[in-house]
Amino acid sequence: MSVGHKSRASIGNYLADIKNDGLMDVVVVDMMPEREDIRKSSVFADPFNIDYVKQRFGYHFQYRRNTLLLNRGNALKLIPGTNTAFNLFSEIGQLAGIHATDWSWAPLFVDLDNDGHKDLFVSNGIYRRPNDLDYLDHIKKNEVQLELNSRKFQSIPAPI
């Protein structure tokens, strides 16, 4: 499979022929919130330096959003130096408007309205947000800071 980038957490995925062309397409769901304010108050991406190191070690571009990979089966690409070819896929999640369904768990293609076309159903939700940066508001409070300052922490060396 050849794609320009991929979903980062890849929580759930589903294979379906969404165009009825005999080729299996792939949807992968992730955690991008639909609302901009939630995106901005969440730990969302790696810092640039970590992203750069990952790329130097050969990791592919990863984004925390849903991806819809449309199979372009007639566009076979030959791997140089081999006789192996594979299908190319186009990532159309943003074009299809399904890239941000919040903390998503499982996608399902099914004809829900009996119109003959497959609909995408995504189960999503999370109790509280473990990646929310709202703890910064609480740690600024004096009583919390005083409590943290009064504790004795033991220094433990990190294993090598």
What spans do the regions from the language model cover?
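Acidic, glycine/proline-rich Ca2+-coordinating loop motifs
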Residues: 1-160
